[in-house]
């Protein structure tokens, strides 16, 4: 037992063995690597996770991905801003297929509480994946960042907090190609 981390069986370093996933993802691609494994080994039908909103890349949305391409192609890496990954949780349960959930520790706690009232949670949500969370920054921090480059949110085509390196740098690209 550790006063900060609580109870644990072991503590290990881990990362994706897929070099492309490891490079493009955050945190060494661990959660994407595990999610891909669960999909490709047919342990689950889909992954419920958070990704960048394709229309507003600074914003996040919850997404259901059925394969590797959908998972990593949707800017599925660290999202350091407001996100509601549980907003599709009941929709995921209603699909009546085994799935995995990737979210923050507080989201996992909410799912555990829901499982006490809805037996489908433990029957269908087979894996709950999370990493350490230090909370999230206010959205205004991201807005201040892009404004320091004289870019407005509606000009963005890509807004990446991390990835493309470990941990990778913050990256923006505008619709007219400015980086």
Q: For the regions a protein language model found, what residue spans apply to each?
A:
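Iron-sulfur-associated redox domains of electron-transfer enzymes in respiratory
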Residues: 1-179
């Amino acid at each position: 037992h550790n006063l900060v981390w609580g109870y644990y069986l072991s503590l290990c370093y881990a990362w994706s063995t897929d070099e492309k996933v490891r490079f493009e993802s955050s945190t060494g691609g661990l959660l994407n690597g595990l999610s891909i494994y669960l999909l490709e080994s047919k342990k689950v039908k889909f992954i419920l996770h958070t990704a960048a909103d394709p229309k507003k890349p600074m914003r996040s949305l919850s997404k259901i991905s059925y394969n590797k391409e959908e998972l990593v192609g949707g800017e599925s890496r660290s999202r350091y801003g407001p996100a509601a990954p549980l907003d599709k949780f009941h929709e995921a349960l209603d699909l009546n297929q085994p799935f995995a959930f990737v979210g923050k520790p507080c989201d996992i706690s909410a799912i555990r509480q829901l499982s006490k009232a809805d037996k489908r949670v433990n029957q269908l949500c087979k894996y709950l994946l999370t990493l350490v969370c230090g909370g999230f920054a206010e959205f205004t921090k991201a807005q201040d960042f892009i404004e320091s480059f004289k870019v407005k949110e509606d000009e963005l085509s890509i807004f990446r907090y991390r990835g493309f390196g470990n941990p990778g740098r913050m990256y923006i690209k505008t619709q007219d190609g400015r980086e």
